[in-house]
């Protein structure tokens, strides 16, 4: 991991038509939730090695993540908790820079708006106006962003959302 090259984008796996897998470098501008694995690793690399190139990379992505968040507010879905925990929250924790904190809190606010009060879940893909609210296993990743937001603000909104969502995860996702 110490040889991770942060200048060439992210290596993504693609399945070809013949069933074989290939690996290609893709730019960070491609809006894919899996890129947050990469930013999370880069944040960890900076935390562990304290090499400036990792911090520069995280700061260099700020505009991309900011644009992606604010230009797609109506499209926020279950990936938001994962994406922003591994980018904005991680960057805030290692830098203390409030611009990362603000971004993470905005993502938590938008994710919290997807909370369906009656069912207790943070809806995955559907509109909250739908008669059926969906939930998938990936929704567990939303908990860390909402719990973090509560720990930062102590706001009862976040506490209510994460407690109801956690109970919904226990009720609907976890099996014996």
Regions from the PLM with identified roles:
Residues 1-176:
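Glycan-recognition and catalytic cores of secretory/periplasmic carbohydrate-active enzymes
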